[in-house]
Amino acid sequence: KQIAPYALEHLKNSDVFFRTQKLADLNGFYKAFGMEVESIERADHISTQTEFLSYLLLKEILAEKDGLFVEMGICQDAFDQFQKDHFSDWAKMFAENTATKVDGIFYPLAGRFLSISLETEKYYGSTTFRRKNDKTK
């Protein structure tokens, strides 16, 4: 459970209805931005969540390129909100547990890399660079 790549496995609440609602919330977030989870993985898998975050960044870049600054701001806000509500806390626990509780070389290194990346983003802020160039403010 400590190294499960699923967000819901890191929550203290194991109620099935709570977990079902959390998965529905994630899928709703994805659908709101035109992404549907069609893989064999659940919506709370780290690969699904990181794919969604990268998708939001891509949409933001394309919106900026096309001069759609309102849409760009929506993507920025969604990225920040998703990271805060659905990703950062559990991903940090997952990264630290992977770095310290898995045997071998690759996964502990990957866990440390993720942990450092999350700490860097927390320190500098996910939108530090983007907000500096934001033409809507």
Predicted stretch roles:
Residues 1-137:
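Surface/interface-facing alpha-helical segments and adjacent flexible terminal/loop regions used
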